[in-house]
Amino acid sequence: DCGLRPPRSGDRTDWARLSQQLEIKVIHIAERDTQLADARKRQDEFVNTWSVSGFVAEGLQPAELGWGTHERHWPENAGRHEFGCDSAIYLNRPGASTRVRSWTPLEGPYEGFLITHSEAISISDHLTVERDGEVVYRPTVHYAYYPCDDAVLSLHEMAGRQWRAQSQARIIRDDVQSGMDELGVLLMGNPRGVYWYGSRLTIEQARDLVPYNNATSLQVAAGVLAGMVWAVRNPDAGIVEPDDIDHEAVLEIARPYLGELTGAYGDWTPLDGRE
């Protein structure tokens, strides 16, 4: 609806140029998990809708984000990696203590956690435009994760313990009573405003689709399934990044398990309400 057609090929150069033409400056992986169980979090317990050990490990890593060419302010305690594609930076603080403002259509504005995820680096690299060996365009990319409410309480408690994990861990699944996972990508910079596109999967939909899942685990499993099927169909492809896999083939496989796939424009900016 901006008068530009997406590339037919998987050539990353074409996708990078499209992102540049759309004036995309920032990309958030914007996720809000509202699932709630009857039994609330207890003291010295970490509660989550997916792997507790995985979330703790990711949250304690230094916050990493793809670093855009439009950025003018160097963050305090930031550094560059001494290896790799040089599309990202890191902050000398845990992602679980790094808050970022973001937006999803149903939640609206929120403060999430800048949790390290590999796609923040690979997407910023994938969408890099170079001219004569010099980087002329690259968006800032990072996660903006607002986990379920009991997981937020768990993070606060762990921070107070000087980042020592609780002795008890509980993954809520069969005891989830309500809520959904709203997981998508927020594009920022286009003159039309922000645009979010992603999956809205309720706990009721997840249980109807595949037993022994909650909304979060099924969204993850759908992507894993699609990747495995693609690998079986392409045995000679070698090692590939997720961004280089045919997205149409992946969505065809994963689509039945993702609930409502939808996109929405908004007029939100990170400066709203901060005057």
Feature map (PLM): residue ranges:
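C-terminal catalytic/substrate-binding lobe primarily of soluble NAD(P)-dependent oxidoreductases
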Residues: 3-275
